[in-house]
């Protein structure tokens, strides 16, 4: 296994031996193997451990083990404690997303402080397979199907070339102990569900399913390199200026519909709106299309793109009965009858509203001076301008923020916070779930 990892590091030029390598060490099998292998290969390592305090005594047990293991290899050890639950609540993030943000921010802080060349994390081949399947289920393009990258900035993943089975066999051979995270044995999370339920079913069809998916991801990663190259060539010819695309140049490329989407998504246009724009290319000029930040005008020979900041404010009328509204941003709507054990996900991109407190139709608009709402969990009014200031919104972020409204009342600062007047309470009978898709 060590030889395989050495070749992988060399192939992708992940590490050199002249500067320290920071290593994320949770205490689990994968990170223990990662540190052990890198030390064996001669890299100067520094171990980093995050205690998220999410699993009671298990979290403290893992920290103690990680410290002892690093000391046994004579590797410097640094650790940090996080109040993950409070961080997630303050930012309306899932626990998983909060832990991810905290971990990688600290890793980068420590890399800069200690002069590290990179931070190595312990994603392996099976993690990559699970990621590909998750992206496929959620809907993705070639980038999502190519899986986890060996390098992402200063984060490197030397174990992507080996499987979980390889890692466990190597640990047993070396006599290394490791900690087991009890949550990894639960299928409560999507990734664990795929690991424990979906992959075993796929292996009944093809016992080599993991290897096959991993190889496919590697091939797609190579194909993505070609894809990016062609896209850059198209950009040079199609993008005449910051606000103008040439229809004629676009149509000379293969797969022009895909190229158009790749160019337009930088301006906030969804795939569905991009498809509508492409369909309009052969029709009469003059039609307008909107993203959350820009307006596009289809002219005879060009697509003209202008920022909504420079244009008159516009209000969009929404119809929750359609299920999904695509313009100017993509929102999905679901009406449910509430039950005693009704689950509420803590996610800034999802709003749970009392259906019977709303006046329809709902509307979507950008903010204006004098706007106010009652933030969820509060009793008093707050000017939206003050909310923006408190949360350090830039001018562009303010202009790009959309407000879901019921009559004159702001129901939801989309992607941020709902209004307390429309919250679910003990009298709620029906719930409207609004999901910000992009």
UniProtKB/Swiss-Prot annotation:
Q: What is its main location?
A: cytoplasm
* Gene Ontology molecular function terms on file: ATP binding; tRNA(Ile)-lysidine synthase activity
Identify the EC number(s).
6.3.4.19
Query: What is its subcellular localisation?
Result: Cytoplasm
List the keywords (alphabetical).
ATP-binding, Cytoplasm, Ligase, Nucleotide-binding, tRNA processing
Q: Where does ATP bind?
A: 26-31
- Record's keyword annotation contains Kinase: no
- Give the GO cellular component terms, alphabetically: cytoplasm
Which reaction(s) does its UniProt entry say it catalyses? cytidine(34) in tRNA(Ile2) + L-lysine + ATP = lysidine(34) in tRNA(Ile2) + AMP + diphosphate + H(+)
Q: Which residues form a coiled coil?
A: none
Q: Which InterPro entries match?
A: Lysidine-tRNA-synth_C (IPR012796), Rossmann-like_a/b/a_fold (IPR014729), TilS/TtcA_N (IPR011063), tRNA_Ile_lys_synt (IPR012094), tRNA_Ile_lys_synt_N (IPR012795)
Matching entries from SMART domains are given as:
TilS_C
Give a yes or no for keyword Cytoplasm in this entry: yes
Among HAMAP family, the record links this protein to: tRNA_Ile_lys_synt
Q: What does this protein do?
A: Ligates lysine onto the cytidine present at position 34 of the AUA codon-specific tRNA(Ile) that contains the anticodon CAU, in an ATP-dependent manner. Cytidine is converted to lysidine, thus changing the amino acid specificity of the tRNA from methionine to isoleucine.
Domain comment in the entry: The N-terminal region contains the highly conserved SGGXDS motif, predicted to be a P-loop motif involved in ATP binding.
Question: What does the sequence similarity comment in the record state about its family?
Answer: Belongs to the tRNA(Ile)-lysidine synthase family.
Q: What is this protein called?
A: tRNA(Ile)-lysidine synthase
């Amino acid at each position: 296994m060590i030889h395989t990892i050495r070749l992988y590091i060399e192939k992708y030029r992940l590490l050199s031996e002249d500067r320290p390598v920071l290593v994320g060490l949770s205490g689990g099998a994968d990170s223990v193997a990662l540190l052990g292998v890198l030390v064996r290969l001669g890299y100067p390592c520094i171990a980093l451990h995050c205690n998220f305090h999410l699993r009671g005594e298990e979290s403290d047990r893992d920290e103690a083990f990680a410290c002892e293991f690093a000391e046994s290899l004579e590797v410097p050890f640094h650790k940090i404690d996080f109040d993950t639950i409070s961080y997630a609540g303050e930012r309306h993030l899932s626990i998983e997303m909060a832990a991810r943000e905290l971990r990688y921010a600290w890793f980068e802080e420590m890399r800069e402080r200690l002069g590290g060349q990179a931070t190595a994390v312990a994603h392996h081949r099976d993690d990559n397979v699970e990621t590909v399947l998750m992206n496929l289920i959620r809907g993705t393009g070639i980038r999502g199907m190519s899986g986890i990258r060996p390098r992402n900035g200063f984060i490197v993943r030397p174990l992507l070339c080996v499987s979980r089975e390889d890692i466990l066999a190597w640990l047993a051979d070396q006599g290394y102990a490791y900690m087991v995270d009890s949550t990894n044995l639960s299928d409560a999370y999507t990734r664990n569900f795929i690991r424990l339920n979906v992959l075993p079913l796929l292996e009944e069809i093809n016992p080599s399913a993991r290897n096959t998916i991993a190889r496919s991801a590697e091939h797609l990663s190579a194909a993505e390199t070609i894809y990016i190259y062609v896209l850059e060539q198209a950009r040079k010819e199609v993008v005449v200026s910051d606000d103008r695309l040439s229809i004629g140049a676009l149509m000379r490329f293969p797969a022009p519909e895909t190229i158009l989407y790749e160019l337009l998504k930088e301006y906030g246009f969804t795939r569905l709106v991009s498809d509508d724009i492409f369909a309009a290319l052969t029709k009469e000029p003059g039609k307008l299309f909107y993203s959350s930040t820009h307006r596009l005008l289809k002219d005879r020979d060009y697509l003209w793109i202008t920022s909504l900041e420079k244009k008159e404010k516009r209000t969009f009328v929404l119809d929750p009965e359609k299920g999904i509204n695509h313009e100017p941003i993509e929102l999905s709507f679901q009406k449910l009858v509430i039950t005693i054990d009704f689950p509420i996900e803590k996610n800034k991109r999802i709003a749970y509203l009392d259906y019977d407190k709303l006046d329809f139709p709902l509307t979507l608009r950008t903010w204006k001076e004098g706007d106010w709402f009652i933030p969820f969990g509060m009793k008093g009014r707050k000017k939206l301008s003050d909310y923006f200031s408190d949360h350090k919104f830039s001018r562009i972020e303010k202009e790009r923020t959309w407000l879901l409204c019921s009559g004159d009342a702001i129901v939801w600062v989309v992607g941020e916070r709902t209004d307390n007047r429309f919250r679910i309470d003990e009298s709620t009978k029906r719930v409207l779930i609004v999901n910000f898709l992009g």
